[in-house]
Regions:
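Extended Lys/Arg-rich polyanion-binding regions
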Residues: 370-373, 379-394, 404, 409, ...
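Cys/His-rich metal-chelating microdomains
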Residues: 710
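Short cysteine clusters
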Residues: 698, 703-707
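Juxtamembrane regulatory segments of integral membrane proteins
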Residues: 706, 715-716
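Helicase motor core with emphasis on the C-terminal RecA-like subdomain
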Residues: 1-17, 21-24, 28, 34-50, ...
Length: 737
């Protein structure tokens, strides 16, 4: 039963929605919330997490509606994506309809029309937004939100497991700024967090919010049967770089499976990691469906970030209504959007973490029925390892969430933003963590902050929130513009522009293919024109690295395993053209893009001459053995840290000028680090053991994309020595303590 303190009209509204009794975990969450305890519910997909926090929230809002101003209590809902916030507003409106005007939900994001925003600030009592809008609009404009913040009872943080790495670290500081302003207005909101099944969710939630958090993790909801298949695409007759065998692409396999399922009337979502992949799967499936039935292609579409608001909303409506049978989607749809009636989920490549894998698989069968989930392996070391070692997916707990709010590159701009919101005092510093006090003199020296009497003030005319992009991209977005018409097709982060919209890149939008004619980094514009090239493109880069500081190290025999600060210089130098469907390399074109410098954290290991002799590594094969070990270790790291292989980079050199030894580096791809390299350091033995095993188990002769070749290698995957890498890692691990 619901706690007695939940209003009877709220309980009646829940029953009117067809829910007679809560599950135990839902009642437990409500009890903690009513007691004023911040709580995280970390149960499976479709376990009713939303209702668990909505019951106390709606009860508080209905109580507050009886206050003289009609807004004695408010609640703030934070979602990582616009799609999830829009879906939650729909769900809240339906559930709270019997309560009349007591609950007034409203979305406040970049798509909200200007004329609606004032109404939201003054009258809405349940505001649904995202961390970006909180950072850029609500907190800097807190004076206009004073009545809302003064009454803030609950802050709901949905899908909190997604707040990891640099993005999670930024969100942690945004939430600390929110708590500081709430305290100024006399409020101390309770945090209600919802997470996918996670490792130690209470610790992760506490690190995110900065307050003690209780966890509810015992899932009492019934589950339909899910059949989970691991699918490895077949080898083709094609040969890749250095004559390596090539498998059929995961994209082509997914498109075929999506086609077959749609023909059978099976409602299916195919998750793919890239915008381009989502568009490509949609296009291929539509072409193949047209051969079967001309009415079917319109029932398949792509859904990804970067669409204009009206396009995104139309797709969401079509999916909810059942008008669409098949959807190729990026993670914009992964997160909690309630798509009732899905029968199957196709996952195109391992999504980077077990938490995301189960989150995506859980989208099917949400009405309690049985469902199908299929993981289609990409031709890379991690995916190949997983389809041959299913116990790594099904018998291991989900990963710990990695974030580092004390990262100075993250913390410094938020101290400036906080000072701009209201002057920063000594008493505030504890809220922002132990690194805050040490950063203030640097911010004063940079003339960003000025100390007057007992507080630090923001000194500039520009907005302090413009100092950082909390998604970690950095810089202003690059606009993708159709040259012939001037039409804006979408945007891409500046950090991704070098690889995504370089000159000659293929860009897909809503099923149409465009070629990038010119990338203007100065004006942040990529000019494109519609075309139909028979290929896709993949950027390649080169990297150099120098050690700034070794923070900690441990001996592995005569070798050393180290962690510390490094400076990385990276340059996109060329791109490959690959044949559609087969992935066959058609050619490589040079690029002239400026190098970029990054100060970050890295893990690295060295080997000595004696160890090389013991592993039978001659000077002729040393570079190839190190290079192969570097590629494979980057590919396997997502099993041990909540990262994507594109979040990290690597460098290997037979003689590094700072270590004076053969050295392999793996570094975080974000300024100041993201916590991934540190996690790699602490799990190094298990991580490198899995790396060695993955290379050794691959059936290829001399290396292939499934083990040691990397799609982004700027050296053309040369040199690589598969057997040398296995011997080298075996020798290194035998000396590990």
């Amino acid at each position: 039963m619901w706690p007695d303190r939940i209003r009877t009209d709220v309980v009646a509204a829940i029953r009117a929605a067809g829910i007679e009794h809560p599950w135990e975990h839902q009642a437990a969450v409500a009890e903690h919330a009513l007691d004023g305890e911040s709580v995280v519910v970390a149960t499976g997909t479709a376990s009713g997490k939303s209702l668990a926090y909505l019951a106390p929230v709606l009860s508080a809002l209905a109580d507050g509606a009886e206050a003289p101003n009609g807004r004695g209590a408010t609640a703030l809902y934070l979602a990582p994506t616009k799609a999830l916030a829009a879906d939650q507003r729909r769900a809240v409106r339906e559930l709270a309809a019997p309560l009349g005007h007591a609950v007034r939900p409203a979305v406040y994001d970049g798509d909200t029309p200007v004329e609606e925003r004032e109404w939201v600030r003054q009258y809405a009592n349940y505001v649904l937004t995202n961390p970006d809008m909180l950072h850029r609009a609500i907190l800097p404009g807190h004076a206009r939100w004073s009545s809302f913040l003064r009454a803030l009872r609950y802050v709901v943080v949905d899908e909190c497991h997604t707040y990891r790495g640099v993005f999670g670290s930024h969100v942690a500081q945004v939430l600390r700024r929110l708590r500081r302003l709430c305290a100024r207005y006399g409020a101390e909101p309770v945090f209600l967090l919802a997470s996918a099944t996670a490792s130690d969710p209470a610790a992760a939630a506490s690190r995110l919010t900065g307050v003690p958090v209780t966890e509810v993790a015992d899932d009492a909801s019934p589950r339909g049967e899910v059949v989970f298949a691991l699918w490895e695409p077949p080898l083709t007759d094609l040969r890749g770089e250095k004559g390596a065998p090539v498998r059929r692409t995961a994209t082509a396999e997914t498109a075929d499976l999506l086609t077959d399922l749609v023909v059978q009337g099976v409602r299916t979502v195919a998750f793919v990691r890239s915008r381009r992949g989502a568009e490509l799967i949609s296009v291929i499936a539509q072409e193949r469906l047209a051969e079967v039935d001309r009415s079917l292609p319109r029932r398949v579409a792509a859904y990804r970030g970067g669409y204009l608001p009206e396009e995104r909303r139309a797709l969401e409506r079509a999916l909810h209504s059942g008008e669409l049978l098949g959807l190729a989607a990026t993670t914009a749809l992964e997160l909690g959007v309630d798509v009732a009636g899905l029968d199957a989920v196709l996952i195109t490549g391992y999504p980077g973490t077990r938490a995301s894998l189960w989150q995506q698989a859980g989208r099917a069968g949400r009405a309690g029925q049985g469902a199908l989930a299929v993981l289609i392996a990409r031709d890379d070391p991690l995916d190949t390892y997983l389809v041959h070692h299913p116990e790594a997916l099904f018998r291991r707990p989900v990963e710990a969430t990695v974030l580092d709010p004390d990262n100075p590159y993250v913390l410094a701009p938020h101290l400036c933003a906080a000072a701009a919101e209201t002057p920063l005092t000594e008493d505030d510093l504890a809220l922002f963590g132990p690194a805050a006090a040490g950063l203030l003199p640097q911010l004063e020296a940079a003339r960003l902050l000025r100390r007057r009497a007992t507080a630090w003030h923001w000194t500039r005319r520009e907005r302090a929130t413009d100092l950082t992009d909390i998604r970690g991209g950095g810089g202003r977005p690059v606009q993708i513009v159709e040259a012939a018409t001037g039409r804006l097709l979408g945007t891409v982060d500046e950090s991704a522009a070098h690889t995504a919209v370089h000159d000659g890149a293929v860009h897909l939008h809503q099923g149409r293919t465009y070629l990038v004619r010119r990338l203007d980094l100065e004006d942040s514009v990529a000019l494109v024109e519609e075309a139909s090239p028979p290929f896709s493109t993949t950027a390649r880069d080169t990297t150099a690295i120098s050690v700034l500081e070794t923070e900690t190290e441990i001996p592995w025999g005569d070798a050393r395993l180290c962690y510390g600060s490094v400076e990385v210089t990276n340059q996109v130098v060329s791109y490959l053209r690959r044949k559609l469907i087969t992935g066959e390399v058609l050619g490589e074109a040079k690029l002239d893009l400026p190098p970029r410098t990054l100060r970050t954290r890295a893990v690295w290991w060295t080997v000595t001459e004696d160890q090389l002799d013991g592993a039978r590594i001659s000077p002729e094969i040393l570079g190839g053995a190190l290079h192969a070990a570097e590629h494979a270790s980057i590919g396997l790291l997502p099993l041990f840290a909540t990262c994507d292989r594109w979040d990290i980079g690597g460098v290997s050199v037979p003689l590094h000028p700072d270590t004076l030894l053969p050295t392999v580096f793996v570094y975080d791809g974000h300024p100041g680090g993201a916590g991934f390299a540190e996690r790699a350091f602490h799990t190094a033995r298990a991580w490198l053991t899995a790396t060695r095993d993955a290379i050794a188990a691959c059936e290829c002769e001399a290396g292939c994309p499934s083990c040691i070749q990397s799609p982004k290698c700027g050296n053309g995957n040369d040199p690589l020595h598969k057997r040398g890498a296995v011997r080298l890692l075996t020798r290194l691990l035998s000396a590990a303590t």
